[in-house]
């Protein structure tokens, strides 16, 4: 039992570490923004311009797109500082996220989630 709990804890830590991995600036593909792995990016209506309010369990389900150390904001691409101090990519001031339930590039299962407050990020 203890061994399976330890494996479960390690899996959770590994998942959290990969979910918040640093990324270069997003790109557009098929009319929507995607991360470096081709996963769909989303915006959250409850975020204020330049401020993410998706923290804790929200950020577990909607991992923020964390800025790689060598990346710089340019044009409509901005960087916001999260409550935990991490830097997150934003487009026109709207923080960007992936969705934990999207399993492959091109999935858009988070679009319209939670009574329509989550949206696919588009150019």
Spans of features found by a protein language model:
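Bacterial N-terminal signal peptides
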Residues: 8-16
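Compact beta-sheet-dominated domain cores in extracellular/mature segments
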Residues: 2-4, 20-123
């Amino acid at each position: 039992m203890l061994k399976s709990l330890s494996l479960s804890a390690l899996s959770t830590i590994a998942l959290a570490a990969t979910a918040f991995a640093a990324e270069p600036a997003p790109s557009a593909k098929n009319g929507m923004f995607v991360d470096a792995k081709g996963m769909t990016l989303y915006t959250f209506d409850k975020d204020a311009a330049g401020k993410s309010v998706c923290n804790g369990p929200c950020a577990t389900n909607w991992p923020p797109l964390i800025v790689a150390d060598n990346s710089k904001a340019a044009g409509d691409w901005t960087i916001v500082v999260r409550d935990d101090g991490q830097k997150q990519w934003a487009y026109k001031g709207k923080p960007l996220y992936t969705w934990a339930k999207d399993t492959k590039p091109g999935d858009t299962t988070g679009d319209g989630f939670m009574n329509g407050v989550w949206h696919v990020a588009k150019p």
